[in-house]
């Protein structure tokens, strides 16, 4: 904060009020010093310490799930996405990204882009084919929703796929809105979000829950570059649509037409009328500041290295007993592991057994039998629009034998 020439008295006043929690958040979008700290944190963790020019405006939210709700709501309220519009969804993906577009309010026409690339020996790479990414060239597709690294495969976009998306935006679909959920980015060495590569098109949702093991704190931010296509597209709406929006936000600003999209999200999150009580609670913002400051002061990234080492240790503890060789992949976060049971069945028992398995059993039989007989709870990958016979294993909360031994 001293690098930002912060006034010490003003800083201490904000922090003292945040600890006490005696006020509504002012500014409502995010507290002043919280925004400065989190901006630096995102530049370090989401942009690999090489942020694009300009500033990202932040909106502090009650976890990533609230951020998702606010994004979908405000995109529609501001006519950026209308009922029945075409969007693209990169799958497998966190289930609500599948279910929300299906709601009657939205009923979006969804183009699924599946991470179905395979190695020559039949293993999943969880990356995307060029011809599928090229679907984004269609200007009818207004928005792309992505979780990066993915959930549940837990892989980051390859450099080739990222560059292909960049070229498509620059040459074919310049108004493509990209909504990226990057909660697992800190588990990838030198991770760079699409917010770093395509800042004008990308709206980033980042939650502190996974990296800091603090899901119960409900701390997240929506990040949107100060120079973005969302504001520009609102400015190009029809006169009728502008009139509707001006009336909607007229109680908040003498010139509602000048309101930024991210500020409209804040107001929308409280049905406009309760905008004066909007924002994440002061204690939650204080905790968010502490998380960010902790990472920023860890100049050698010791915490990050330890978290990544724990994940990889557990990943190998899982896979070393499967009969498969887990090839090292710098794009693998490892927070989850998605295991395709049909790949296993084919490798060890052949095609005839695969056919028998599919004919005789249901994919859910695997997870229910594991739960009943071993008390091991996994999720079926089909619910994430992944392979029907895959299962998702959560490694971050699944201690390896070494973890148990070290805890004694």
Q: PLM ranges: what are they?
A:
Residues 3-4, 21-26, 118-127, 153-159, ...:
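Short, flexible/disordered intra-domain loops and linkers
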Residues 5-173, 185-199, 203:
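Conserved core of the PLP fold type I
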Residues 195-260:
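Active-site PLP attachment segment
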Residues 243-310, 315-318:
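Structural motif of enzymes handling amino- and sulfur-group chemistry
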Residues 287, 294, 301-319, 326-354:
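Conserved glycine-rich beta-strand-loop-beta hairpin in the small C-terminal domain of fold type I
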Residues 328-335, 339, 356-392:
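Conserved PLP cofactor-binding pocket of PLP-dependent enzymes
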Residues 396-403:
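Conserved small/polar residues in nucleotide/adenosyl-binding loops
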């Amino acid at each position: 904060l001293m690098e930002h020439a912060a006034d010490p008295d003003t800083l201490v006043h904000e922090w003292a009020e945040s600890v006490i929690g005696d006020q509504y958040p002012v500014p409502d979008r995010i507290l002043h010093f919280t925004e400065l700290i989190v901006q630096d944190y995102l530049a370090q963790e989401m942009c690999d310490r090489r942020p694009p020019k300009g500033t990202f405006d932040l909106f502090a939210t009650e976890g990533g799930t609230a951020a998702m709700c606010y994004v979908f709501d405000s995109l529609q309220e501001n006519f950026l996405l209308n009922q029945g519009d075409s969007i693209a969804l990169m799958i497998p993906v966190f289930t609500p990204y599948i279910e929300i577009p299906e709601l009657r309010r939205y009923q979006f026409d969804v183009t699924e882009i599946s991470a179905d690339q395979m190695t020559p020996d039949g293993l999943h790479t969880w990356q995307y084919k060029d011809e599928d990414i090229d679907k984004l060239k269609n200007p009818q597709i207004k928005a792309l929703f992505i979780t990066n690294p993915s959930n549940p495969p837990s892989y980051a976009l390859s450099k080739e796929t990222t560059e292909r998306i960049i070229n498509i935006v620059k040459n074919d679909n310049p108004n493509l809105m990209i909504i990226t959920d990057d909660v697992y980015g800190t588990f990838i060495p030198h991770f760079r979000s699409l917010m770093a590569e395509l800042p004008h098109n990308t709206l980033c949702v980042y939650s502190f829950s996974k990296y800091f093991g603090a899901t119960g704190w409900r701390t997240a931010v929506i990040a949107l570059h100060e120079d973005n296509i969302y504001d520009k597209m609102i400015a190009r709406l029809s006169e009728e649509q502008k009139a509707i929006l001006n009336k909607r936000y007229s109680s908040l600003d003498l010139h509602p037409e000048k309101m930024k999209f991210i500020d409209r999200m804040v107001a929308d999150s409280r049905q406009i009328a309760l905008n004066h009580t909007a924002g994440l609670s002061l204690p939650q913002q204080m905790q968010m500041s502490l998380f960010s400051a902790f990472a920023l002061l860890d100049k050698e990234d010791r915490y990050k290295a330890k978290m990544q080492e724990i994940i990889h240790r557990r990943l190998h503890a899982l896979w070393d007993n499967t009969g498969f060789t887990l090839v090292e992949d710098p794009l693998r976060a490892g927070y989850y592991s998605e295991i395709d049971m049909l790949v296993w069945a084919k490798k060890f028992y052949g095609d005839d057994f695969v056919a028998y398995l599919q004919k005789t059993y249901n994919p859910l039989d695997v997870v229910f039998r594991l739960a009943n007989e071993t008390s091991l709870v996994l999720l079926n990958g089909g619910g994430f629009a992944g392979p029907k016979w895959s299962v998702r294993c959560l490694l971050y909360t699944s201690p390896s034998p070494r973890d148990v031994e070290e805890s004694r």
